[in-house]
């Protein structure tokens, strides 16, 4: 069969699968029964917040989607997730969430007793059992139902038995409260009555069929089986291992009522808000365990009544990533697909979205009664949107770093070094040695001996600053405690606590960070301390590993880098002015949406945290530090962090435009993206934006200083594009940058009557 026919057939099957009128349309075509599982995947992780990660970062579980009747929509999708730990101990209250009451598996007749093996006779497989078996793999499993009369035994292949058991968290020796594997490899439940007096569970004999799962097979053509390479469906026409266990488990007792409220984990996990990360209280051990059981416990929601579903792919193959489910009360649940399967889930959601839209048109159901938003983000950029030198530089390693040092220890070819760091970053093993150069604590012309002498001198100065702080008068100390120390003491104990370097009670590294921040407030009282500075100091201390050196690196960061946490309003306003102009130049549609929102939209509240905390809370630490290094390299601009902001908007801001989000919704949209954006993708896009900006033959005078301070590098002169005046210079008759105002032609004047001239008319920018 050709690939086109295969995909069309797969699409047809998906339409049958997701028909919003369970029970069929009477045309004889196959349909999905109420409660039918249509997607399942094991080892889908839930990650607890920082305060609970000491009890384990990864909490894998079993996730499935199944159909359920809905009075308003006809049918809806139910998402259920059960932690592997509860499956392992056969927690029936938890298992009922992934095999609902209406499921045909639940309604299937169960054997009342064990079938004893005939003495001296071994079980011989019947011709029916010799048919090709369907293997539930540890990869993603999509279950497609068919109405068929024949019976067929479905079991894993022998080589997959151990893999299946491990994927479900089943050990070789099973205690009585855990599931066991039958010879066919299907998980089965052992009731307390089946346990022997010695406390050991009896192993099923070869002739026992108690742990087997029977599926109907008649009418299923060979063409209905989709290859895993089709990127559409995998493992069709089979029930999941958990459903198999529940189908034949005679010891299981299910509650017949399905009206219990959703798991308390709905309210247990909130996404980071616009002002900071989730502020997790400090629990004692019993409270931590209880909170963990709530957050990482059974989770079940009706996807048809959620606010949004978002899929974030994190790998180039677009199989792994995160699923973020948001309720209408703006509560979030994040599921991590570390081992693939997210692409298949995306196929299911897209088909469901299409069917739902068709159903809404037919029944005229209000859109606000269903899932309002659905989006997919894939980490790919077209080749036309990448810097031409993107793949030419590798990460700066030890050997490459040593090649830049001469015999005296001086850094040679500084421009090439900064360019290499801009494109490739720095290896973790040498960050502590290279960062002081980027932060201008060390001069590139300094020798090794001069740097050692500088360290001794700066250590003495640091000691004097600390002594000045400790020798304050009582009145000075009270004022200092009220204005600085109180906030510092509150912040340092919750900064980067998931980092091993700062983890644990009475950690001396936390005290070092505290002293650095307090001493900096004494060293620079005009700046003092503002919330967020601890987020900047912590990574530097963890890499430099010396309190005095870290202090002076932080001083260099605050003095010589625009990419800092600044408490002054005028600095933030300057950053926002540049960012608005960049968006006007590079992303016209988004800028026009901001203008349509008025002054609130142009304030761009969604990006304030990006600028104040240097993206520390928007990306995982490894990616955030890569962004820091690219900004510290000062390659071709001192404002590369603004290009990072534009890149985020360009990649993740389409939903804002398409859905015409208001200011508060836009703030929520970008806040929800925290820790789910692809840092490498954003970096590549930002480098491309900078490259295209440098190619512009003319720029608005409002962006004249964007690339002025970084120097010309190896060239005799810097970039000198023509400057076009924007005309916004109150109190000045002429443009201070020598910009010229282009006189419009009569033709453009006639066109101007039809509407205002957009930035896109004045500046050509290759997207």
Swiss-Prot record:
Residues 107-117 have a biased composition (Basic residues). Residues 197-206 have a biased composition (Basic and acidic residues). Residues 175-194 have a biased composition (Polar residues). Keywords: GTPase activation. GO terms for biological process: regulation of receptor recycling. Signal peptide: none annotated. The keyword DNA repair does not apply. Residues 93-138, 169-228, 729-767 are annotated as: Disordered. It holds the Pfam family RabGAP-TBC. One of its GO terms (cellular component) is cytosol. Residues 425-635 form the Rab-GAP TBC domain. The keyword Transferase does not apply. GO terms for molecular function: GTPase activator activity. Disulfide bonds: none annotated. InterPro entries: Rab-GAP-TBC_dom, Rab-GAP_TBC_sf. May act as a GTPase-activating protein for Rab family protein(s). This is TBC1 domain family member 16. It comes from Homo sapiens (Human).
